């Protein structure tokens, strides 16, 4: 039985990365350094822009985060692909929250737009995922739109995020 709470702490997210939150057959979040959130502040199966589910999560920004030291030397900025990956992570996490089983894999995105950046001076990144559709049959797949906010301002948007859960990834 899935522990379906509305919010999750950093410790809960780390438990997910070890396969402990949604069970051995459920999807896992990545471990640090690739875990791109500190907490999930809201999860609902009937909210969001399409009334099909909503997730909101946050990442606290610190100037000593690993990516600022290498992207770019003398011009530190969080790579945009990490924000995109965070949105995929949250789509997969939501599928596990719904009781989906399998290994999560990003399947694509329709369009991504970057209109801002995350610098070491930022305080908080917020991710919002609005589900368009969830298929929960032999194929388990989530389709959603997402946005990334830096200190309250929308800086990335993504449409048609897709994540699937697979029992066997050998042929993937």
From Swiss-Prot:
Pfam families: FabA. InterPro entries: FabA, FabA_FabZ, HotDog_dom_sf. Necessary for the introduction of cis unsaturation into fatty acids. Catalyzes the dehydration of (3R)-3-hydroxydecanoyl-ACP to E-(2)-decenoyl-ACP and then its isomerization to Z-(3)-decenoyl-ACP. Can catalyze the dehydratase reaction for beta-hydroxyacyl-ACPs with saturated chain lengths up to 16:0, being most active on intermediate chain length. Belongs to the thioester dehydratase family. FabA subfamily. This is 3-hydroxydecanoyl-[acyl-carrier-protein] dehydratase. Keywords: Cytoplasm, Fatty acid biosynthesis, Fatty acid metabolism, Isomerase, Lipid biosynthesis, Lipid metabolism, Lyase. The keyword Lipid biosynthesis applies. The lineage of its organism: Bacteria, Pseudomonadati, Pseudomonadota, Gammaproteobacteria, Enterobacterales. It catalyses: a (3R)-hydroxyacyl-[ACP] = a (2E)-enoyl-[ACP] + H2O; (3R)-hydroxydecanoyl-[ACP] = (2E)-decenoyl-[ACP] + H2O; (2E)-decenoyl-[ACP] = (3Z)-decenoyl-[ACP]. It comes from Sodalis glossinidius (strain morsitans). GO terms for molecular function: (3R)-hydroxyacyl-[acyl-carrier-protein] dehydratase activity; trans-2-decenoyl-acyl-carrier-protein isomerase activity. Its main location: cytoplasm. One of its GO terms (cellular component) is cytoplasm. The active site is at residue 71. Homodimer. The gene is fabA. The keyword Transmembrane helix does not apply. It is found in: Cytoplasm. Pathway: Lipid metabolism; fatty acid biosynthesis. Its EC number is 4.2.1.59, 5.3.3.14. HAMAP family: FabA (MF_00405). GO terms for biological process: unsaturated fatty acid biosynthetic process.
